[in-house]
């Protein structure tokens, strides 16, 4: 315990009062990241926040209804297009295949004597085989 004279004592008490008042407002050293965050963010009140207000909730419901209608209309359109458009896989097949017409090859004309002998030789062969 220290003893002060009356003037010194008054000054000492006055300094203590000033330091006590300043301690409330004076900065404290930051000891942790949690302490730092609490100082930066400040005091947050414990209020309950709603994500959507009434008007926003109503607009959200309306948007969902419109989305359902749009999806239904798209599905309906696809089914109509499938029914009305000719299908690529449902082509009718012909019953009988068309035969290719054989091309007639023209023979070179040769002398009449040689052509007649060729005809005779071919007919002779045919008659021999039959």
UniProtKB/Swiss-Prot annotation:
The organism's place on the tree of life at top rank: Viruses
Compositional bias per record (Basic residues), positions renumbered to this chain: 86-110
Annotated segments matching region Disordered: 1-47, 78-130
Compositional bias segments (type: Basic and acidic residues): 117-130
InterPro entries, sorted: DUF755 (IPR008474)
Comp. bias regions, Polar residues: 13-33
Protein name per its UniProtKB record: Uncharacterized ORF3 protein
Organism, as annotated: Torque teno mini virus 1 (isolate TLMV-CBD279)
């Amino acid at each position: 315990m220290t003893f002060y004279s009356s003037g010194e004592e008054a000054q000492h008490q006055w300094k203590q009062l000033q330091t006590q008042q300043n301690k409330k407002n004076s900065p404290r050293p930051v000891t942790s990241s949690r302490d730092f965050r609490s100082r930066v963010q400040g005091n947050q009140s414990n209020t309950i926040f709603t994500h959507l207000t009434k008007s926003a909730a109503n607009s959200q419901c309306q948007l969902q209804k419109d989305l359902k209608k749009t999806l239904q209309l798209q599905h309906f359109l696809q089914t109509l297009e499938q029914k009305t458009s000719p299908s690529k896989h449902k082509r009718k097949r012909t019953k009988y295949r068309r035969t290719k017409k054989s091309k007639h090859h023209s023979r070179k004309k040769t002398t009449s004597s040689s052509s007649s002998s060729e005809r005779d030789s071919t007919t002779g062969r045919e008659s021999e085989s039959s």
